[in-house]
């Protein structure tokens, strides 16, 4: 009798879908001050880990992140590896994540991705990314930087990789200018990613609406 009860419990556990694993990343834009808010948006729905670049740390407050979110920096890439055979952090994070969301995406990191550069933890993850899994970017930069011809070329490169753009919005920017280039609000980024994920899951299960 006890064994039958345990078997039923095991079946219930096995049929419970796990939460999506979302890797959130911030690069060096003043919009990184909203990164803690972004993490909070995702934590109830998904299992979240965070990666930040060195320059983003000038803007974001580590204490603003939810306690359950593990934060990784460039230093962790090297401190976690001592010898051949040890886990490589950017590979482990790429394997762990179901979805990667870069918000904010700075002009500098945009250029690095488009050029295939991998000189920090975040860009190494992107270079090693499995593009059968979704990757979203939410750019944030000055209006003139956003309108620069290089930006258009870089965005085309991202589109060819299958990266999904969450476009910036028009508002008063941190520099005082008014125009396009502000990062989309964290709530919009969250809803965009969740809607995409749930629509993909719906298609895979053969559901119809």
From Swiss-Prot:
Underlying gene: HAL3A
Impact when changing residue 174 to S: Significantly reduced activity. Can reduce the oxidied intermediate
Pfam name, any one: Flavoprotein
Cofactor dependency: FMN
Alphabetical list of InterPro entries matching this protein: Flavin_trans-like, Flavoprotein
Catalytic activity: N-[(R)-4-phosphopantothenoyl]-L-cysteine + H(+) = (R)-4'-phosphopantetheine + CO2
SUPFAM superfamilies named among the record's database cross-references: Homo-oligomeric flavin-containing Cys decarboxylases, HFCD
Tissue: Expressed in roots, shoots, leaves, flowers, developing siliques and seeds with highest expression in seed embryos and phloem.
Disruption outcome: No visible phenotype under normal growth conditions, but homozygous double mutants hal3a-1 and hal3b are embryonic lethal.
Residues the record marks as active site: 90 (proton donor), 175 (proton donor)
Protein's recorded name: Phosphopantothenoylcysteine decarboxylase
Protein purpose: Involved in plant growth, and salt and osmotic tolerance. Catalyzes the decarboxylation of 4'-phosphopantothenoylcysteine to 4'-phosphopantetheine, a key step in coenzyme A biosynthesis. The enzyme is also able to decarboxylate pantothenoylcysteine to pantothenoylcysteamine.
């Amino acid at each position: 009798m006890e064994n039958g009860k345990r078997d039923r419990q095991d079946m219930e556990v096995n049929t419970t879908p796990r939460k999506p694993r979302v890797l959130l990343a911030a690069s060096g834009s003043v919009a990184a001050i909203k990164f803690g808010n972004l993490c909070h948006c995702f934590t109830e729905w998904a299992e979240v880990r965070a990666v930040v670049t060195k320059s983003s740390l000038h803007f974001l407050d580590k204490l603003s992140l939810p306690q359950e979110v593990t934060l990784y920096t460039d230093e962790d890439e090297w401190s976690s590896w001592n010898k051949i055979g040890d886990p490589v952090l950017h590979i482990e994070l790429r394997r762990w994540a179901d979805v990667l969301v870069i918000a904010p995406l700075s002009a500098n990191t945009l250029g690095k991705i488009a050029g295939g550069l991998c000189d920090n933890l975040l860009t190494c993850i992107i270079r090693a990314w499995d593009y059968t899994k979704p990757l979203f970017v939410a750019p944030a930069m000055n209006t003139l930087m956003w309108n620069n011809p290089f930006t258009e070329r870089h965005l085309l490169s991202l589109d060819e990789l299958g990266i999904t753009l969450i476009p910036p919005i028009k508002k008063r920017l941190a520099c005082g200018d008014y125009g396009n280039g502000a990062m989309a609000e964290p709530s919009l980024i969250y809803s965009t990613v969740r809607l995409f994920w749930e629509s993909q899951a719906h298609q895979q299960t053969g559901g119809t609406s």
